Regions:
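Transmembrane alpha-helices of Major Facilitator/SLC transporters
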Residues: 68, 206, 291-323, 334-342
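C-terminal ends and interior cores of transmembrane alpha-helices
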Residues: 89-110, 336-359
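Conserved MFS/SLC helix-loop-helix module at the cytosolic interface between two early adjacent transmembrane helices
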Residues: 69-102
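Hydrophobic core of transmembrane alpha-helices in multi-pass small-molecule transporters
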Residues: 22, 97, 108-124, 354-383
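Short amphipathic helix-loop junctions that connect adjacent transmembrane helices
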Residues: 33-56, 274-296
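Intracellular loop-helix junctions on the cytosolic face of multi-pass helical membrane proteins
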Residues: 1-16, 137-141, 166-290, 313-323, ...
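Glycine-rich segments within core transmembrane alpha-helices of 12-TM secondary carriers
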Residues: 66, 144-173, 189-200, 299-306, ...
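Central cavity-lining transmembrane alpha-helices of secondary-active solute carriers
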Residues: 56-77, 159-161, 300-313
Length: 464
């Protein structure tokens, strides 16, 4: 049996990709934090004055296609471009999209800017993730820890962006109109988001050759015939032998099995931006002394927990106990923890019910219920998302690595649709019932995934 030599620490290329992704996520989440406000605010208030229903529909299509285009960008990178060039094209295109939103400040500029962001994300997103996986040999247990570190970069950008962009739009560049209304500096928020993307690209292009070597410089479709047999074959890390086509197909089938479970996880998790956010706005006591915390600020709680907890998870996955946990078990536990998180929201509903009329917006539940929900959801996320990214790079044949990474990211697209339907039942069923059903369903899914552990491992052919 071939044993993969384990090394301590991580290659410096990981930290280059960490900062590149951090600035890209800063750019994206900074723009996303103000997009719906920019669409719906009146022109005199710094917005475009769109109808709210149309704006929500446009927002949904935008975020949906952001998760769809990586399928195309991943295929182009694998077949023609190479991952490094695809990341550069994607980054520059997204930067131009942000600058278009800033420069034109019109409906035409909006559509052009959003289109550039959608296209750019398609090139960037799947390929930078597969570059992380390419830093490690098959069977290297550091890979899960590496994706946890990488995931911390994603959330560091996501945490900082709404705070920085909020100051830019609401304070630094906000002005008062003659009628006393405020004109927000949303276009300057897009400018700062574009500058963030520019910083990420400068770092990536200046240091890429030094810290990544020739990783991702060639598309699989461009390698020589002699190299094709080496590049396109997957290896069983337990035996050191090449996998045949049947075994590779079984590995790919595992990606789709885990994707189904991931859809249900994210459908529950994404309630943070819909049903949980609305419940927080109406029924959670957000006051600390005389200060009331803006509802939007709670979108930074999850990234804050990610940045805080990710180093601990990195150490845990690298520990003897962590190395023994298989991917299905990790992800199953993550789903169960998500379900437990919703129990705290059920507790918030119960507190309000005990205090009086549940429809009275003055009847508030304690803030701690919400914080505990976000904490447990974050722990569940750390068991699902970086582990999922890692296992896709392990299971994918090299010739399909970026495409299958893009397929994995489609789980978020489907989850947002499912999550929207779930959230729509809050008005008729009540928040408590919806939270109860989510908690029960995702927990059952988690238990089922753990029970399927042995079956799935057989299909993974040496990957754990």
């Amino acid at each position: 049996m071939e044993v993969v030599q384990q090394k301590k620490g991580h290659p410096k290329g990981l930290y280059l990709l960490f900062f590149t992704e951090m600035w890209e996520r800063f750019s994206y989440y900074g723009m996303r934090a103000i997009l719906i406000l920019y669409l719906t605010k009146k022109f005199i208030e710094g917005g475009l004055g769109m109808d709210e229903k149309y704006a929500m529909l446009l927002y949904g299509y935008f975020t949906g296609f952001v998760y769809f285009t990586p399928l195309i960008g991943g295929w182009l990178a694998d077949r023609y471009l190479g991952k490094r060039l695809a990341v550069m094209i994607g980054g520059v295109t997204m930067m131009l999209g942000q600058f278009t939103l800033f420069g034109l400040n019109s409906t035409t500029g909006l559509y052009i800017g959003l289109l550039l962001l959608i296209i750019g994300n398609g090139f960037f997103k799947p390929n930078i993730s597969t570059l992380v996986g390419g830093l490690y040999k098959d069977g290297d247990s550091r890979r899960d820890a590496a994706f946890t570190i990488f995931y911390m970069g994603i959330n560091l950008g996501a945490m900082i962006a709404p705070l920085v962009i909020g100051v830019v739009t609401d304070n630094m560049f906000a002005t008062t109109n003659e009628d006393g209304s405020i004109a927000y500096g949303y276009r300057y928020g897009f400018l700062v988001s574009g500058i963030g993307m520019l910083l990420g690209q400068v770092i990536f292009n200046l240091l890429g050759t030094k810290y990544l070597g020739d990783l991702g410089t060639k598309p699989v479709g461009a390698v020589s015939d002699t190299e094709v047999a080496k590049v396109q074959k997957s290896i069983n890390p337990e035996t050191g032998k090449e996998l045949d086509e049947k075994d590779e197909k079984q590995r790919i089938s595992v990606i789709f099995i885990l994707l189904i479970f991931a859809v249900f996880f994210w459908a529950g998790f994404e309630q943070a931006g819909s049903s949980l956010s609305l419940y927080t706005d109406k029924y959670i006591d957000r006051s600390i002394g005389s200060f009331e915390i803006p509802t939007s600020w709670f979108q930074s709680v999850n990234p804050l927990f990610i940045v805080t907890l990710a180093p601990l998870f990195t150490l845990f996955w690298a520990s003897p106990i962590g190395r023994r946990l298989t991917t299905p078990v990790k992800m199953g536990v993550g789903m169960i923890i998500l379900g437990v998180g919703f129990l705290f929201m059920i507790g918030a509903v119960a507190e309000r019910s005990a205090n009086g009329d549940v429809d009275d917006v003055n009847n508030k539940a304690a803030l701690m219920w919400l914080i505990m929900t976000y904490l447990l959801h974050t722990i569940g996320e750390l068991c699902i998302s970086p582990v999922g990214l890692s296992v896709v790079t392990k299971l994918s044949p090299p010739k399909l690595a970026s495409v299958l990474m893009a397929v994995w990211m489609l789980s978020s697209f489907f989850a947002n649709i499912v999550g929207g339907y779930i959230a729509s039942y809050v008005e008729t069923m009540g928040a408590g019932e919806v939270f109860k059903y989510i908690a029960g369903f995702v927990s059952v899914c988690g238990v089922l995934l753990i029970l399927l552990n042995r079956v799935i491992l057989k299909l993974m052919h040496g990957v754990k």
